Amino acid sequence: MEGTRLGFEIVGDISNIETVAVGSSIREIARLRRQYGPGRWRKLKGIAMVRLPDATLCRAEVHWYESHGMGMCEIKVKRLLEE
């Protein structure tokens, strides 16, 4: 999975996945529905290894939106984690 246009790439799987919000609890729900279409939108977070633009590998907390049939959208690195 790549997020290179965002300046990072996810390497491997995302672990410790948790749901942050669902449906109308998502602050950006109107924009998501307008931009990507209707669906059961969820905001999730998890831990992943990411490759930064300088080729450094590190663990990071990542957040993203997901809808059935749509997959992952707008993946963001929220913070880098200490090893």
Where are these regions (language model features)?
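Cysteine-centric segments in proteins
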Residues: M1-E83
